[in-house]
Amino acid sequence: LPYIVNRAQFMGLSFYVDEQVLIPRSPIGELIEGHFSPWLTTAERILEIGCGSGCIAIACAYEFPEATVDAVDISNAALQVAQVNVDRHGLANQVRLLQSDLFSALTLDGSAERYNLIVSNPPYVDRADLDEMPAEFRAEPMLALEAGEDGLDLVVRVLSEAAAHLEDDGLLVVEVGNSQLALQQLFPDVSWIWMEFEQGGDGV
């Protein structure tokens, strides 16, 4: 239905959507509403990796009105959708959209741009889940879903490249969905913090 009416809700906000982006449904919205407490101490600069429709970046801009928000995506088509939403919400002065393969475009004068908060809902659907995916999800862009045999192709890159772009007290939040177990098995020595959501969702 959202693709038919070109509209979807996220955190009580209305967004334009079409077949170039995922329908907003991330449980990260619950963390945004709670201002990422108790982990986030400062939010002057926020980055969303793989922004799609821009819903997470825009929601962050509303919840942190003093912050500057960068939102990147590798897909030009997705960025066009995000631009519609940034303009409709009147946030062009606060939210900057960039085409980038993850962090590749985020340099300033030769140095990595740094952020207090980096949020990402990258593709994380593994091969088995992709084969069993319900029909309603197959209308969504595969570029935003498919992530290799174990669902971690993009997740591992985000985790490995984020450190160079985080402030010393910065926070990284990544949604990995059903690939949570595979991630724990790949990095057994990491002390992951997994969220519990009142409104449903896991793997964050």
Regions found by a protein language model. Name each.
Residues 1-65, 72-81, 198:
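SAM-dependent Rossmann-like transferase core, predominantly class I methyltransferases
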Residues 33, 66-68, 72-204:
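S-adenosylmethionine
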